[in-house]
């Protein structure tokens, strides 16, 4: 396997192949095949997302994949932002369609004509829905599995509210949702507000969640958008107020994709392979029997006990592979916890355990299994977050002049907000502005022009 530190790009591609996450040999560029192990990880990520939004009164829907050109063109600024990325369906069978149909690049234009039918009065608000679907964008840059592709596994939440204040409260709730998700995936991040020229087409403002990979490049792993009434006015989404007058709904959206999996791979993996957070590991505990009297029966008993407390567990009973091969194989697949069982463990009623991200072995009593394993999985997750935060901090640097932008990582510096200064920074340092740091109230002189500025984040990005 490639060395992660010396050649991150090759290491990343190799680990996806070796761990059997995805197969990019499908004969349409940028549309990869999800393999069972990769799809199971993604499904577990989706489950975390669903739990986080379901308990906050979102409801799941599923909209058609095709959007008529006339529906897209209702919001001109929106379609202009995607016009170079849209796949168009122009024929049905042999007949040319009367109206071109787009494969959804995102779902505003599909959903909002329906919002205008569903929302009639203040009693219908707030409306909070989401879907997890494929979206399609004709990506012309170099494609990379889970990072830059043409068929994207996409979570999108859409809301409508009676007032701007209610919509702003929803934006705050999105941050709360993201904190919950990121804590389980062990992903550190920045909140930053994108500059106007980089916000989502049609939005009042966009806030992104950015992390940094060991290559020093940033990876956008989520965005939230405040639409105000920009879309509701164009799609005629209005409601009857209590005073008998009509007003337009205020809207927000939240988007994430399989880049979450890319971040997990890139941030947590090592030269042995994947390191998976326990909450998204298809197999949380792998049991390796060391051949001997009574070993397999003992291993099955341990497996049944862990199954009974909802631990995802598997006994590796393959006969033609050595224990050493199995150790390496499951390490490469990122299984958080390994249990070794030989004749000694059977005799002593013990278990030998190894954690994927913490060196060394421990011996635990069989009688304490149902307590020790869940506690150990929590310890693994906490250590993963600790390690990830260290890597994140090691790749964030403060700069007071352009000469200090030459490090591999995220740069924080004061910026006045002008496009001219942003362009100068990019031209001289190859780093572009991500946005103003949302959680920072610091002010100072712009690193380029010396005018008053706020703290911003800059990087090379995927």
Swiss-Prot record:
PANTHER family: BIFUNCTIONAL GLUTAMATE_PROLINE--TRNA LIGASE (PTHR43382:SF2), PROLYL-TRNA SYNTHETASE (PTHR43382). HAMAP family: Pro_tRNA_synth_type3 (MF_01571). It is found in: Cytoplasm. InterPro entries: aa-tRNA-synt_IIb (IPR002314), aa-tRNA-synth_II (IPR006195), aa-tRNA-synth_II/BPL/LPL (IPR045864), Anticodon-bd (IPR004154), Anticodon-bd_dom_sf (IPR036621), Pro-tRNA-ligase_IIa (IPR002316), Pro-tRNA-ligase_IIa_arc-type (IPR004499), Pro-tRNA_ligase_II_C (IPR016061). It comes from Thermoplasma acidophilum (strain ATCC 25905 / DSM 1728 / JCM 9062 / NBRC 15155 / AMRC-C165). The gene is proS. GO terms for cellular component: aminoacyl-tRNA synthetase multienzyme complex; cytoplasm. This is Proline--tRNA ligase. Catalyzes the attachment of proline to tRNA(Pro) in a two-step reaction: proline is first activated by ATP to form Pro-AMP and then transferred to the acceptor end of tRNA(Pro). The keyword Electron transport does not apply. One of its GO terms (biological process) is prolyl-tRNA aminoacylation. The keyword Cell membrane does not apply. Its EC number is 6.1.1.15. Homodimer. Pfam families: HGTP_anticodon, ProRS-C_1, tRNA-synt_2b. NCBIfam families: proS_fam_I (TIGR00408). Belongs to the class-II aminoacyl-tRNA synthetase family. ProS type 3 subfamily. It catalyses: tRNA(Pro) + L-proline + ATP = L-prolyl-tRNA(Pro) + AMP + diphosphate. Keywords: Aminoacyl-tRNA synthetase, ATP-binding, Cytoplasm, Ligase, Nucleotide-binding, Protein biosynthesis. Consists of three domains: the N-terminal catalytic domain, the anticodon-binding domain and the C-terminal extension. GO terms for molecular function: ATP binding; proline-tRNA ligase activity.
